[in-house]
C-alpha cells in the first residue's frame, strides 16, 4: 500500500513538472491587430515568453509569472506578478494592467485565455516543442511588438548555435526524466529536439509515446539493460535528486555507469525551456558530452 502511494505521488509530481513542456509556442493568436504602430503592452504567463518579450522590449512587459528563474534578474524586479506556481493567473490583476495581449500556455492557461478573450483582450496560446518553434516564436513576437530590435537568439544562446562535431553521430544517449515511472523523451519533446540538435543518437527518439505524458515514453529496467546506452542523461526535477537513479537494481550493470558517462541536467532548460539562460546552460552541457 505504501509503495502504491509513492508511485501515485511520483505520477502527481511528474504531471506537475513535465506538463508545462507541452504548454509552451505553435502560436494561435486571437483578436490582435498586427498592423498597429503603437507600443504594445504585454502580460506573459510563462517564464519563457516573459524572457523573450523582455529581451525584445522590456518596456512592453507589464505583467509576468512569479518564477525562481527571475529571482536574480534586475530587469524583472519591478514588473507586477500575475501568477505563482501552479496557481491560475489573477484575471482581475491582468485586466487592471490593460494589456494589448496576453501570452499563455496552451492547455494550462486555456481557461484564463478564454475569459480574457470574452472580455475583449487579445491572447496568444503557445506550445514550444522544438528549437524551430522557439525561433519562430521570437520572430513573431518581434512583429507583434513593432520593435526595430532584431531577434538575437544566437547571441543569447551561443552554446546552442555551436558547430556540431560530426563524431557525435557515433554517440548514443538515453535521457531519464524520472524513475517512477521511468520516463524517457522521444523526438516529439523539447529535450528530444535538443538532443537531436547536437547530433546524438537518442535511443528513444523514434519510439511511440503511449502514456499520459506526450513526448515521453515508459521504459523498464529490462529494456535499459538490453539497450545499454553509451551515455546517460539524468534529469533533476525540483522535487528530486540525481541520487534517486542509483536505486535501480541494474545500475551497476550499465556500461554508461561503468564508464562514468553520466551527465546531470536541470529540469529548466532541458525539459521545460524555462528561460533563455536555462536553455543555454542545457546546450552547454550537451556540447560537453
Language model: regions and residue ranges:
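Structured C-terminal subdomain patch of bacterial secreted/periplasmic proteins
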Residues: 40-41, 45, 132-146, 150-155, ...
Amino acid at each position: 500500500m505504501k509503495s502504491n502511494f509513492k508511485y501515485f505521488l511520483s505520477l502527481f509530481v511528474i504531471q506537475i513538472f513535465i506538463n508545462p513542456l507541452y504548454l509552451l509556442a505553435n502560436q494561435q493568436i486571437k483578436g490582435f491587430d498586427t498592423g498597429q504602430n503603437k507600443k504594445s503592452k504585454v502580460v506573459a504567463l510563462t517564464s519563457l515568453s516573459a524572457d523573450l518579450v523582455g529581451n525584445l522590449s522590456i518596456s512592453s512587459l507589464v505583467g509576468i509569472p512569479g518564477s525562481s528563474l527571475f529571482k536574480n534578474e534586475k530587469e524583472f524586479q519591478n514588473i507586477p506578478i500575475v501568477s505563482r506556481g501552479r496557481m491560475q493567473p489573477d484575471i482581475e490583476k491582468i485586466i487592471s494592467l490593460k494589456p494589448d495581449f496576453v501570452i499563455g500556455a496552451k492547455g494550462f492557461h486555456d481557461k484564463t485565455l478564454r475569459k480574457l478573450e470574452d472580455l475583449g483582450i487579445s491572447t496568444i496560446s503557445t506550445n514550444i516543442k522544438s528549437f524551430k518553434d522557439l525561433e519562430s516564436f521570437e520572430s513573431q513576437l518581434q512583429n507583434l511588438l513593432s520593435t526595430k530590435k532584431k531577434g538575437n537568439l544566437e547571441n543569447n544562446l551561443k552554446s546552442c548555435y555551436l558547430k556540431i562535431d560530426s563524431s557525435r553521430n557515433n554517440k548514443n544517449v538515453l535521457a531519464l526524466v524520472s524513475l517512477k515511472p521511468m520516463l524517457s523523451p522521444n523526438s516529439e519533446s523539447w529535450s528530444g529536439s535538443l538532443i537531436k540538435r547536437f547530433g546524438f543518437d537518442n535511443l528513444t527518439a523514434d519510439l511511440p509515446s503511449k502514456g499520459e505524458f506526450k513526448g515521453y515514453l515508459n521504459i523498464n529496467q529490462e529494456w535499459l539493460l538490453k539497450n545499454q546506452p553509451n551515455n546517460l542523461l539524468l534529469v533533476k526535477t525540483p522535487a528530486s535528486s540525481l541520487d534517486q537513479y542509483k536505486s535501480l537494481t541494474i545500475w551497476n550493470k550499465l556500461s554508461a555507469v561503468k564508464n562514468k558517462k553520466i551527465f546531470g541536467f536541470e529540469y529548466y532548460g532541458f525539459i521545460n525551456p524555462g528561460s533563455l539562460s536555462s536553455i543555454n546552460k542545457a546546450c552547454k552541457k550537451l556540447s560537453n558530452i
